[in-house]
A protein has these predicted regions:
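Short alpha-helical "recognition helix" segments of helix-turn-helix
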Residues: 25-26
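Residue-level detection of the helix-turn-helix DNA-binding "recognition helix"
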Residues: 16, 41, 71
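Short, basic-rich loop-to-helix N-cap that marks the start of a DNA-contacting helix
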Residues: 43-57
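Recognition helix of helix-turn-helix/homeodomain-like DNA-binding domains
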Residues: 30-46
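A short, Lys/Arg-rich alpha-helix, primarily the initiator
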Residues: 1-21
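Short, charged recognition helix plus adjacent turn
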Residues: 38, 67-81
Length: 81
């Protein structure tokens, strides 16, 4: 699975865990809702680390926590590029 899809799925998982929908997470993180929707729906070809960091702040987690999953650890480095 490519990294963009993994990021999208991870955000959706964390939203469900923390009780957020797209708009509420965007508001909490200070990110435009369209930016978050573009990441989730696969329209963003390169979700930036700064945006992911803002989302983590809105969720109250660290970047480490965001990426500390089996799926990210087993991602083929070729898929990241």
């Amino acid at each position: 699975m490519d990294t963009r899809k993994l990021v999208s799925l991870r955000i959706q998982q964390l939203c469900a865990t923390h009780g957020y929908n797209i708009n509420s997470l965007a508001r909490q993180a200070g990110v435009p809702p369209t930016t978050l929707k573009n990441i989730i729906y696969g329209n963003s070809h390169n979700p930036g680390i700064v945006t992911i960091k803002l989302l983590c702040g809105g969720l109250g987690i660290s970047l480490y926590d965001f990426f500390d999953t089996t799926q990210f650890k087993s991602t083929d480095p070729e898929d990241i590029i």
